[in-house]
Each structure stands twice: as structure tokens, then as C-alpha cells.
Amino acid sequence: MILLSQAYELKLAPHPAPFSVLKYRGFDDVSRLYRYEVEFTSPVAGIPMDQVLGRPAKFIIDPVDPNLDYLRKMFGENAEKFSDKPPARTIHGIITQFDEYGTSADETRYKVVLEPKLADLDRGVTSRLFQKQSVEEIVTGTLRHYGYQSGVDFQFQLRAKYRRYEYITQYHESTFAFIQRICAQEGIWFRFEQKRDRAVIIFGDDLDAYARNQRTVPLRRDAGLESAGAEAIRSLERQTLRVPEAVRLHDYNHRQADVSLLVEESAARDDKTTHAVDYHWGEHYETPEEGRRIARLRHEAHLARQITYSGKGNAFSLEAGEVMRLDQNPADAPHGLFITSVESGGGRSEAYWNTFTAIPADRVWRPSVDLAKRPVIDGILPARITSPGDYKYAYLTEQGWYVIKLPFDLDEWSPGGTSRPVRLARPYGGDNYGHHFPFIDGTEVAIIHTHGDPDRPVIMGAMHDSLHPDLVNNLNNTRNIIRTAGGTEWRVEDKQGVEHSHLTTPYQTSELNLGHMVDADRRERGQGAELRTDGHLSARAAKGMLISAEAQPGGSGEQLAMPNADATLQQAEAILRSLNDSASAAQAWLAEVDQQRALVEQKLAKLQKPVIVASAPEGIGVASGQHMQLAAARQMFVTAGEGLDIGVLKRITIAAGDAISVFAAKVGIRILAAKGKVQIQAQGDAMELMSLKDMVVSSSDGEVVITARKGVTLGDGAGAYLKIANGKIEIASPSEVQVKGGLDVDGPAKGNFTFPGWSGSPLKDAKGNMNFGFSE
């Protein structure tokens, strides 16, 4: 076919003025926007910008058949049916640039740039979030958002199945650059097909998405023999590169921290021309299977550039993304060439021409992924914690992650769905232990990103702002405070002279205060230590507890040091042992000194057993507004170095299951009753009243009655006695009997006496504690 000349036409809707195309140059690449620079002249000068810029346009290249005049003579109106010229090519788009060069008397020279409508998505940068979508779904949703119709304005011809990403971020990049980037990362490329009324975007990922126009172009290297206008490839050059033999990837997925993500893949294992392993960290995949898929895509991208061709010619209507067959296909491309880029040109004084780059058509084209060109978020980005419905407490996942609202995200999301769950970096952590103060809705947080990747945010910490002021400022700059949203607080004051630690919770106002104590207005309310609550308080120590008022200056000394208590307990043991010796001599019942010694030496000393030792050098006071109970399951010891005073306003009861022994070694025993009877009874045995010296039995306002059912005997140390028994009186004396005073002897008479009686049943053994009870 002979193509000596072409007709060029530029059409706008509406058309502002007559145009005559002077020349053009076009650029078309796979996965890029095509660009046609068209220069033209017009008899109209000063065409307004708004009549051209941004308007839909068509650039038409229509070959001229040099034999058309002859065919018209032969066939008339049917001449074009017998012409060999290919159909005209129409490039659709919009005008993105409009220049005016100069004006002469006859015409004005202009230049426009025609690009696809998709170029409008490359004008300004924006930032958006996409969640739980595949790349195909993201691209489809984005293009539809801007008015593109699926199946009409764009089509997907994909073979692979693509996973849904939890989170993909468009950050400070144009929408076109974002689409271009995420497609490249998945190994998806795109091309344009010029239809009758529009340019259609075709997304593909394999050989079957290549455009196949079923034509064969002659390869005619310039030899001066062929006709100068014949459609052909005039030159074809091959370039080969030594590429990596494999791609190795590695990453880390904190959701499966024990799973290794180190993978390596090769798409050409038997190729001896390859060498080295291309290793990258941080492609952001979650499983080894996904990693191997990405590694294979990256190696296929290397292999797609292993063999490349560059050519020149005038093959008409050559497009990036199509397969071109040659009548002499190269040995490395037996199935033809896949065109990756085309540059073309022509005009009034220049025949149509083009240059191209290509790869063998049996190789899968993969866009190159330049990691350095990915958007990067450097430094700290502010964000806010979000939750569904202003959740009162921290809204967390099972793993303890948060949902955040990023400042650049202008989309409306369902409550609590503004981001994927984001991890919180903490100063300390481990297997179910660590440091975590939960954030609630509205908290400002500082966000950083792993490797600067916008898809991998991490919460670094919380920030205060005008809505959430800091709890430490110039007014309390000596205080260190940890306070929760619920009001639980730990405050440490560093101001010299009033240092303190204050731990409190609002519930029942439970507090621990150490050091200098102040109220809410910083007025002093005490010093030392205080543990208080409006509720219950318990103190437990499984190995023993020491409660002591003994001084340890400067906090020095052993934890269980209690020298004063030890001395007092040892003194008590010595006192009781000494009193026992005296009691033994007096034939009184003895105290259980051995048990006391065992208690002191084997249990109380150094808290060898679970005991409580309470010690105070100057005294201990125990007070109760109502009742008090002291109980011991076995033995109770009460010892004092000087005296024991027990005062009860109403009454005292002392009861013993076995016996009571009261012994006074020196001064004596007094039992007095200011009012009421004094009763002493031996209800089950004899009673002995003995004294070393005089014994007085008297009644100041009554009589003394001495009775005994079996008799009464009064005797002295010399042998004289008076015996009353069995209804008779017997008087005896080893010497004389003196009777002073009158003596009346009458007939017999009888007295009537009442004798007490007691139950003969024995007392039951008391099971449990023996108590001293003190009551009102």
C-alpha cells in the first residue's frame, strides 16, 4: 500500500473558527496518557481561550490514496470501495493546552495539546481512603465518581483474581497517578482504544488483553529499492539486558508475627543470561502466598525489559498496547511485537512517520514499580480517635487497636468506620503485659507510618489541644500527673518541702497519700501517710504483717526490724515466767509459759509464721464506739510490766471452762462491791478460805450466818473446839471452859436453815474460742 500523503483535521465541539492543520506530533505509551500536539493556522485571530481550552476534540488522520482520481474515473461514486487506503484514524480527547504563536495579514498560527479525558484526573492532587476493596473495585468506583461508565468508557480484561485490601490510601497525588500506581503494583496495565465516538480505557494483566488488529506490516530496511511511500518498518533494532534471575521479598505481619514472609520467585528459571537476586523489604503483603505472587509480578517486570525493540517506519494507525506482526518476525519475537510506546508525526510538508518501542508479544508486559515514587508521609500526622455513636469508653478491637479519623480524609464514613484498626505504639509491652492507657472518642493522636507508607499508620501517642487541654501547665509545673478519663489519678508533687504522692479513685473516694498532704486548694491537711476510703478496707499479708510506730530514720533498716517489739515480747515472757515461779510456790495454777515462749520465739520474731505484730514505743490505743471482740482459738496472753487496769461502767463477766487462778505475789487481792451482794460459791466441790494472819468475818449492818448441812466446827490451835452437828452442840477444851454472862437453859428448840442445791450434770467442754467479753 502506498501512502504518499495524509489529510489532517482537528475538530472541536462547537468549532470556533476554520482550522488548517500545519503539523502534529503524537506520543502514546502503555499505562500513560497519550498526547497529541497539533499546530494549525486560522484566518481568525485571537480565538478566545474558553472556545478551545477544555473542549472535547477529535484529531483525524485520513490517508490519501494517490490513485483515487483514477478510480473515480473508472468507478465514479463507488471509487472508495476499490481503494486500498486504510480507514481514517480518529483520536478523541479534550484540549488541555492552547497557544497562539503569531499573526500575519492572512492567518494566525496556533497550537493545541489533545489528551484523553482521563487527563483531567491528573490536574490536582487529593487524598482519600479506600477500605476493604480490590484494585479493580477502587478504580471502578473512582472512575464512576468522575462520570465514567463501566463497559462504555472503561473495561477490565483481567485474568487473575485480586484480593481486597484492608486499607489503601491516596495521598497527595492526582487521581490518575493513584490509579496508575495501584494498577502497577498489582501488575495491571492499561491502554486506549479509539472507538467511533470515544476513547475507551482497557485494563489488562495478561497476553489476552493485548490489542490484536490482525495485520502484518512489511519489514523493509532502507535499501533504496522500495517505493518511498510504501507502508513499512524501515528499521528495527534489538536491545537486551542482563536482568535479575529472581526477586526476593520480605515483610512482617504483626497479625501473624510467627509466620515468616520471606519469599523468592523466578519467572525464568532456565535463563542463563540472568544474574543476581533483586531483594526488597516492605511490599506490604500479609501471607507467604501473597508475597510469592507479588515477587513473581516484579520478576515478570524485569523480564519484560530483558529484550526490547525500537523501530522506525510509517505503519499507519500504530497504537501502544497492540500486537504488530511483521512479515519477517525476529527470532526472539516469533509471534510479533507488543508495542509499548509510539511517537508519530506528519504535516503539510512532512509525510506521516512513527517510531516505536516493543517487546516480544509472547511476553507479559508488567509496568515497572518505582518504590521511590510512592507517596511518603514523613514525620507526624495528627488524627482523632473515633467510635460508633460517641462511645463513652475506649472503642477497641480484640487486639487493642483503634479506629482513627485522618485530617485529610474528607469522605463520610459510618461511625467507627473511618479507618482500619490501627496499632498503638507503647513504651513497654509483651505477652499480655505492658503499658496501655485507653484513648476515648475525640482524643487527638500523633500518627507515623511504617517506611512512610500511607497504608501503614501507627499511633505514636496522644496529643493535647485547645479542646483537650493539658493537665500539667505553668500553674502546676512541679506536679507529675497520670489521670484517667474517669478521674482516677496518680499525682506526684516535686516542689521542695511539700513533696508528696497522691493516688485516688472517685469511687468511694479511696486514696493513698504519702508525704505532704494537701486538699483540692493546696492547703495543708497533714503529713506522713494516709490510706482512706468511704468503703471497706482490708489489709492482707499471707506471710505475716508488722504494724509498727518504731522509727527508721531516712527509710533505712530492715523491713521486718522491730527491736522495741522484740524487747517488749521478751520482757513479757520473762515477767510471766517470774510470776509463774511465785505462783508455783503458792501452789497456784501456772500460766502456759512454754506456749508463750513458742509464740514469741518461733512465730512472732521476724514474722516467721503468718502472724500480726503491732508495736508502738509510746503506746497503742484501740477504741470502738460500740463493741469489741478479742478471741484466740487456743491461748491468750496478757502481760504488762507494771499494771493492768480494767474499767467497766456496768459489769464484768469472767468464765473459764476449766479453772480460774488469781494470784498476787506481794500486795494482796481486794474484791469489793460498793453496792449489791458479793457471792463466792463452790458449786461442785469444797471451798477453802485461808490466811497467814488474822481473818475477819463481819457484817456492819446485819448478821453473820454460818451453816453446814453436816455440821459446823470452830476450833483453835490449842485443841479447844465447838462442834454443831446432828442437832447437838459439842463444846470441848483440853483445859477449862469459861462462860461469862447470864446463862439460860430452856427446853429443846430447833432452827430452820435452807441449804443451796446445784445440778449434778457436768459442764460441757467449750468448743472454740475462750473469750474475755467486755460489754456495756
Predicted regions mapped to residue ranges:
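Amphipathic alpha-helical and helix-coil boundary elements used as assembly
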Residues: M1-E776
